[in-house]
Amino acid sequence: MWKKIILFILICLFAAGSAHAQGYGVGTPVEAKNMVVQAIAYLKAYGEEKALQEFNKPNGKFQWRDLYVFAYDLKGVMKGHPNPKLIGRNLYDEPDSKGKLFRKDIVDLANSRGSGWVDYTYMNPMTRQEEAKITYCQKDGDLIVCCGAYLP
């Protein structure tokens, strides 16, 4: 009898832990926008050089759950990203897996409205699958600061 009760409790704990773990690592669009607002405040307070150093840090201040801040210049060159392989690359004309030139959309949006949302498809590093993503971007001087969330 006790073995069945203990087994039942262990199964319940495992199920609860699994459900919690699945939702824990997923950021929302609202959280992504808030990260951009915080990143812009950091940029204004500490300057571009220090801000980009912080954006580039794996597990730095601007990485949380599956969210991370990244930044382009006004020509689509990646200036800040936790993946060092992307830094310095001009990605303006590089499409997503469905052919959308989303970085062009980001630059156009920043130049026309200053801030807003861009949607596209991107490789989710947590699931290793191409997934729909929505990214909030805001222009500050010569930088476009962005953070995106994967959509369910």
Regions found by a protein language model. Give the residues of each.
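N-terminal membrane-sensor/transducer module of prokaryotic signaling receptors
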Residues: 2-9, 14, 19-152
